[in-house]
UniProtKB/Swiss-Prot annotation:
Belongs to the azoreductase type 1 family. This is FMN-dependent NADH:quinone oxidoreductase. Keywords: Flavoprotein, FMN, NAD, Oxidoreductase. It catalyses: 2 a quinone + NADH + H(+) = 2 a 1,4-benzosemiquinone + NAD(+); N,N-dimethyl-1,4-phenylenediamine + anthranilate + 2 NAD(+) = 2-(4-dimethylaminophenyl)diazenylbenzoate + 2 NADH + 2 H(+). Quinone reductase that provides resistance to thiol-specific stress caused by electrophilic quinones. Also exhibits azoreductase activity. Catalyzes the reductive cleavage of the azo bond in aromatic azo compounds to the corresponding amines. GO terms for molecular function: electron transfer activity; FMN binding; oxidoreductase activity, acting on NAD(P)H as acceptor; oxidoreductase activity, acting on NAD(P)H, quinone or similar compound as acceptor. Its cofactor is FMN. The gene is azoR. It is an enzyme of class 1 (oxidoreductase). Gene3D superfamilies: 3.40.50.360.
Amino acid sequence: MANILVLKSSILGQYSQSNALIDGFLADHQSDTVTVRDLATLNLPVLDGELASGLRGGDNLNERQLAVMAQSDELIAELKGSDLVVIAAPMYNFSIPTQLKNWIDLIARAGVTFRYTETGPVGLVENTRALVISPRGGMHVGSATDLVTPYMRTVLGFIGIKDVDFIYAEGMGMGPDAQAKGIEQAKGQLETLAL
């Protein structure tokens, strides 16, 4: 039995292809312990100067900083306690959803999920794999317009998650036939993963 953390980030609700793919994946993992975070409804704060300063810690934190520090600690504990994190990362304007970026800003903390050394940064999230599910309106895999894959691989690797699989559902905005084909290909990729 595995501990699975699921991060949904689509703003499309019931029309979300990434949510539908995740739900299909979870149907095959009912014996696992699953925590689902819908980042689109969680209203995580956008990082600003006050919050960035607060996330570094200290003795003189204000109420807002203390609340966000507690929220960050909770999100990090969920992540570190997971064997697998399943991340919905649909491509919006060549990037990830703001809601997912807000989560990343709260869990990427020096001394907590990574540390700097003389030889470079070292990730502190250990024994966790990641599965990134990324629907896209067009065809972007392997091209310069795919900014999602290198970003997610880099940020996850930076905090210590090196074992990352990507599932792509491409052509979601190219008509019903392309959409159906993209969904079927993504489902096929999910079925072949040994997770």
